[in-house]
Amino acid sequence: MAELMLLSEIADPTRFFTDNLLSPEDWGLQNSTLYSGLDEVAEEQTQLFRCPEQDVPFDGSSLDVGMDVSPSEPPWELLPIFPDLQVKSEPSSPCSSSSLSSESSRLSTEPSSEALGVGEVLHVKTESLAPPLCLLGDDPTSSFETVQINVIPTSDDSSDVQTKIEPVSPCSSVNSEASLLSADSSSQAFIGEEVLEVKTESLSPSGCLLWDVPAPSLGAVQISMGPSLDGSSGKALPTRKPPLQPKPVVLTTVPMPSRAVPPSTTVLLQSLVQPPPVSPVVLIQGAIRVQPEGPAPSLPRPERKSIVPAPMPGNSCPPEVDAKLLKRQQRMIKNRESACQSRRKKKEYLQGLEARLQAVLADNQQLRRENAALRRRLEALLAENSELKLGSGNRKVVCIMVFLLFIAFNFGPVSISEPPSAPISPRMNKGEPQPRRHLLGFSEQEPVQGVEPLQGSSQGPKEPQPSPTDQPSFSNLTAFPGGAKELLLRDLDQLFLSSDCRHFNRTESLRLADELSGWVQRHQRGRRKIPQRAQERQKSQPRKKSPPVKAVPIQPPGPPERDSVGQLQLYRHPDRSQPAFLDAIDRREDTFYVVSFRRDHLLLPAISHNKTSRPKMSLVMPAMAPNETLSGRGAPGDYEEMMQIECEVMDTRVIHIKTSTVPPSLRKQPSPTPGNATGGPLPVSAASQAHQASHQPLYLNHP
């Protein structure tokens, strides 16, 4: 048996290499037709090839192949008639025409060397017309197609005819279409002639659709030798017109059964070019000449051979391999395209990432600067806030301290050192105890010596009198030195006068002033009736309009000790009074004064005190009514007439009076006896009661 080898290519395999990377320009719009053409071939390749179950003989009426034997000696006489032919069809390289011829010669010598016997090589040359237009490249090659047939005899009287068919021209593309063998195309084989001329009509493509490299022809011509059905010579076998279909690069082995009649062979020609249905069809007639390589011996008798196209494959047996190869090539192209696109996308993505990174870095730097500025501003604000907090705290503390100090100076107790006192009498230096105040009293048994009746008003000028060298010192805790005392007094006067502005009745004020003046005058007249007094007392009570009377300081220290019983006596010679004494008591014209040098006084403290008003003080002293009938009390011995003066304490202070300024009548006093307000002696019961009252807690007397 013989094998039928089919080989077809749709593209040059040398075009693709491992290091052949397509540039982005290769995937432009100019190569879109190549991809569309490959896709169409992939879709139609399953319909182009079919595996026939049996060989279909061609009749001479269907295929008219004329073969003219030009040489004088036919090449078929010396060669045995082989029933099978092995045809190998390969496209030539589209590089140059020299490569075509070299490839043809190389392929033609290979089967001859493998033959078992002496063989001859038949060259079949097919000529075709040039296409009207070629769009593939700049160097269109020749349009001739050379078919080389090698006929090699075998040991079992079987000859294999190897035929190499080269493509007509590199301008033929995938879209080229071959028409069926018509009646115009004829193939005649003459036994007696050495030259076998095969006249075929082939289609020429209208134009090449590839741009860069012209693709080889996809068509292939298959020539097979088979036994002739009829033994008559000189008549061509009836053949039919099979379509020429394209076939990818594939090596197909088709077993051919041996025929019983060896003299008759059948040559089948099959074109594997399938053009698109819309492309124009151009018929090209070419003559195929088979020439022997060596001298061909003459044959005893000519035999007729019919060249018929090979049967079309019906099933999808060979296309399975072809489809894989085509898909692999398409995958290769798509992979390269996708790789290029992925690289381009990756590059664009990286460029976008770099741009975004630069923008983010710029924003980050700007945010860092803003953050630093805000941090500095925050630190400045915190420092300022801390300073303000400390300042406000100090300010609050200072305000509170000033307020507390003001309260302490105005309402709290003040301890101020007292000024230097006057010279102390020798009796005080001897350590005699200072007498205390007690109730005033008069004694009738001991008349007062050297007392003159009071003449004139108490408001007149005083007569200067000599004073002894010794004088007691008065002091208390509220004494002030020098100018500070006067300033504090003025401030206190302003404070009390401004805070207590009471409204008073003018008529009532005049009535009180007149009553006090009358009391002083009556007391002075009553004192004139007394011839002599046991002690000299001096009392100065000026006449003024304002009702309040200044009180004598409480518990004055240090005068000479006197009798516990004494008599109240007014100053009787205002004309001879000393100005030094009046200046010592700081006499004012609008104030009544009650001056007493006695130590016996009954002092009753206040049980409660109203903090919203000044402290009040009531003075109760002996007084005499204008006449006894006005008193309304009956006999003078039953009742004591007393003058009660209600006043508010404006100020208390300690004054120092020199002993020399005190009138002589008031300096030395005998032991007084208790008496009444009119100068009369007090009853013994009253004196004893006064002495007993000194032991009570509400009385202050001499110890």
Swiss-Prot record:
Glycans are attached at residues 476, 505, 610, 627, 676. The modification N-acetylalanine is found at residue 2. InterPro entries: ATF_bZIP_TF, bZIP, bZIP_sf. This is Cyclic AMP-dependent transcription factor ATF-6 beta. It is found in: Endoplasmic reticulum membrane. Residues 2-86 are annotated as: Transcription activation. N-glycosylated. During unfolded protein response, a fragment of approximately 60 kDa containing the cytoplasmic transcription factor domain is released by proteolysis. The cleavage is probably performed sequentially by site-1 (MBTPS1, S1P) and site-2 (MBTPS2, S2P) proteases. The record marks 440-441 as: Cleavage. Residues 660-676 have a biased composition (Polar residues). Belongs to the bZIP family. ATF subfamily. Residues 87-114, 229-248, 293-317, 447-479, 521-565, 660-703 are annotated as: Disordered. Residues 2-396 are cytoplasmic. Pfam families: bZIP_1. Residues 350-357 are annotated as: Leucine-zipper. The record marks 410, 413 as: Important for cleavage by MBTPS2. It is a single-pass type II membrane protein. The keyword Transcription regulation applies. Keywords: Acetylation, Activator, DNA-binding, Endoplasmic reticulum, Glycoprotein, Membrane, Nucleus, Signal-anchor, Transcription, Transcription regulation, Transmembrane, Transmembrane helix, Unfolded protein response. The chain crosses the membrane at residues 397-417. Residues 522-531 have a biased composition (Basic residues). The basic domain functions as a nuclear localization signal. The basic leucine-zipper domain is sufficient for association with the NF-Y trimer and binding to ERSE. Its main location: endoplasmic reticulum. Residues 89-114, 685-696 have a biased composition (Low complexity). Residues 418-703 are lumenal.
